[in-house]
């Protein structure tokens, strides 16, 4: 094939303008699909030979040529050419140069439409497997940290106001559960990714006696796509992945927001290792939580990629349209960003320094055991709404005295309810509050440790 000649140029009376070449070429980013393009071509060629569509000698030449091309790509010796538009035609050009007519026969019973759909699915399947493993790694770090702090008391918040005491381990386990669902979503998404489009050709299938099941088996697909129009035109599997990725990033963004708050002097709950922070060019004292801030910021970009793909697909008629070329950069960046975020997050949390004293002191502020006092009254026969009102009055009284509920005298408390007795002070302690939530899903240290054991049994070794 001549270097400047297009595979489809026979129909046209003049060459494509250089600006149009640059505008329409995708090889600048879809070269990343080369490994998967070659995998698909190996399987396609073997099927063509097995069904006697091409001779065995052509298969041998194609396999040898593809092997050489992959070595050239891995070694940085492959010459990517803009005028060949994309990863597929660049590889085909080189294969034809190496093998002659055998290389020209590889595209029999195949279109770039089903070829690229196959490449993307192979790429995304591998990415999902890697991301799931990274989620497991982060979950193990969360469990290790939660185990260390199963009994470390911190304030639980609603509306960012002190609500009730919780254990820091219990708080961390909330993110374990979020990541558990995130991993399950990806595993479910993988089922829909793992279907073979190859054989759909341009849009209507092919007149050759192909064996799609053979190709599916060789490439590890669970099934074939059962409608040729759908196989080449939809990218819902990529959108589903990006939605799952956006949820993962959203969860990590929430944790990042908390790390940023907890690291501030106003909280002082944690210290993030220096290697994850930067300083200020003007303020010598500054230690800025750049990694959590960037996770929070990059989440917006991942959300944007999801919207971009949805918008890309929303008005396309069947079947394939050139619009779909724009699916790759958002998808690639989503995969790259998510993998980097999960990797760096596991390392950052593993080196987290926790200040239990600061957490405990914060839990003592804000009347975190007020609900425990209300529950105490209910257990002694007071209707909950009456108990709620009684404790609210006691809190206002304590505020005026600038002390905690547990620092009031028994006589002070009995002003609000005569049924309050000396045993009330057991439930007004932070430890008593934690211990009283001793049921599955509760924040009692015993339940936190049980939850950690259960969680470890859910993860692979």
Swiss-Prot record:
Q: What does the record give as the reaction this protein catalyses?
A: 2-(N(omega)-L-arginino)succinate = fumarate + L-arginine
Pfam families recorded? ASL_C2, Lyase_1
Where on the tree of life does the source sit, at the highest rank? Bacteria
The biological process GO terms on file are:
arginine biosynthetic process via ornithine; L-arginine biosynthetic process
Single GO MF descriptor? argininosuccinate lyase activity
Q: Does the keyword Cytoplasm apply?
A: yes
Show the Gene3D superfamilies listed in the entry.
Fumarase/aspartase (C-terminal domain), Fumarase/aspartase (Central domain), Fumarase/aspartase (N-terminal domain)
Name the UniProt key words of this record, in alphabetical order. Answer: Amino-acid biosynthesis, Arginine biosynthesis, Cytoplasm, Lyase
How would you classify this enzyme at the top EC level?
lyase
Output the Gene Ontology cellular-component terms.
Answer: cytosol
Location in or out of the cell? Cytoplasm
Q: What is its EC number?
A: 4.3.2.1
- What metabolic or biological pathway is this protein involved in? Amino-acid biosynthesis; L-arginine biosynthesis; L-arginine from L-ornithine and carbamoyl phosphate: step 3/3
Query: NCBIfam families, alphabetically?
Result: argH (TIGR00838)
PANTHER family this protein is in?
A: ARGININOSUCCINATE LYASE
The record's family statement is:
Belongs to the lyase 1 family. Argininosuccinate lyase subfamily.
- The name on file for this protein is Argininosuccinate lyase
Task: Name the source organism.
Answer: Nitrosomonas eutropha (strain DSM 101675 / C91 / Nm57)
Tell me the lineage of the source organism: Bacteria, Pseudomonadati, Pseudomonadota, Betaproteobacteria, Nitrosomonadales
What gene is it encoded by?
argH
